[in-house]
């Protein structure tokens, strides 16, 4: 498979001499969407890719198509994340890159349509899955001398989402997690960043895609988001979030600093 060539704007921020060839990569939520497309891109660049997903049939098919490996993984279970990392290390001798991408829509509201089971499922997959993924990946990357972790957040992690506050809550959690963990593990040459796409052409918008189109809201192509993902994987930065919008290059979101405390007047 011939790898897609990076645009010059993406290459500028890459680590000197960074290549995906022979890198060991683990991708959760790898059976479809961003996970599958990123796996295909990296495999085309010569990486050794493990796709992890709870959907076994679709995951195995995706792995076969890109020439990678598959392991069934429920990211709600911390032991499953450890097993996925161990599988990658066993197959390819280590772990260089982890793309923590598993995610779902909420399926319930905050009050009238609130459902405790759906709420917990969304929080476990979208937020706990990233926590467990980092927890499992960091020790393996330490043994490798460093690595890169990218977590899928969302524009919902950067702004208010009145129609799905629970989804916004777990995606804000992912943003806060990578911003806080990134500077800590950067000291060990392990970079942790987040990717925050807008409405993209994946299954997560299937229930309201028609409405978006009718309102004239552009749907982002999956490959455009993958551009931003692979850019972050190769970037020297850590603790940052990049957003992806239709018609714009993926770019860093600039958070405002909170003013410091003011000393009390004597």
Label each region the model flagged.
Residues 56-57, 73-83, 116:
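The beta1-alpha1 cofactor-binding region of Rossmann-like NAD(H)/NADP(H)-dependent oxidoreductases
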Residues 134, 170:
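Active-site helix of classical SDR
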Residues 6, 194, 211-255:
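C-terminal helical subdomain
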Residues 154:
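Residue(s) in the substrate-gating loop at a strand-loop-helix junction
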Residues 112-131, 150, 174:
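Catalytic Tyr-X3-Lys loop
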Residues 13, 105-120, 163-166, 206:
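Conserved mid-core segment of classical short-chain dehydrogenase/reductases
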Residues 159, 168, 180-190:
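Active-site-adjacent segment of SDR/Rossmann-fold oxidoreductases
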Residues 17-49:
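Canonical Rossmann dinucleotide-binding motif of NAD(H)/NADP(H)-dependent dehydrogenases/reductases
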